[in-house]
Amino acid sequence: MKHAALTLAVFLSLAACAPKAPDGPPRPNAAGLVPLPCGLGSLRPFSTGYCIFNRNFVTPQARDVAVQAAAAVAKQYPGLVVHYMDASGPDGHRPFAPHLSHGDGREIDLALFYTGADGHPMFKPPGLTGYRNYEPPRPGDPVMCAGQSGGARDPDPPVSRHWRLDEARTKALVEAVTRDPRVKRVFLEPHLKLRLGLRADGKIHFQGCRAARHDDHLHVDVL
């Protein structure tokens, strides 16, 4: 027990002491990557585990994109926090398990926004990881991978689930990300693109049926 506590303390110390330029963002490591913020700003990890286990490394440009998008949405919705999940490891190797991509520091998973069943906004998605809070197609919505499930295509959640997509805040996040010229593309399920009324600007893509569902998070790919 003491050993586990000591190990956790060391991880926390390392995460807190990433080298920084004077009055600026962290300095890139040997792979040219920097950690995403782990503090209390408008961009935060969904769980401290993403920082402790070094799953939050990105290029300096990708960091700027995420920080600025979060700030833009927080300006529109004061007090809002954008939560990130997996980005890349510090070594820059692809692919970054369990993903089919990630790893080079140019890709970040951002959580969508939710309300409770009562309609009140949730501060962060339910669950332990930020993933798998799926918002399934409604009747009449496009269904891209009908009949496919398993590791890549998990089944829909029950109708009785205690969360629902917060469409206004999620749309604001997608628009803040896609309007940045440094963003190459984002992955989002077609039924959410249609439901949110997102314009076809060439950046919002369907990831295919081999990859994980993207109606629980936004995958951002930076140039």
Question: What are the roles of these predicted feature ranges?
Answer:
Residues 78-80, 104-108, 182, 214-218:
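Envelope-exposed proteins and targeting segments
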Residues 23-24, 117-223:
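Catalytic cores and adjacent binding grooves of peptidoglycan-active enzymes
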Residues 6-14:
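Hydrophobic helical h-region of N-terminal Sec-dependent signal peptides
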Residues 1-4:
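Positively charged n-region of N-terminal signal peptides that target proteins for export
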Residues 65-97, 185-207:
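Extended, low-complexity, intrinsically disordered C-terminal regulatory tails
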Residues 22-84, 166-183:
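Active-site acidic/histidine clusters and adjacent loop/turn architecture
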Residues 98-113:
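Short, surface-exposed glycine/acidic/tryptophan-bearing loops
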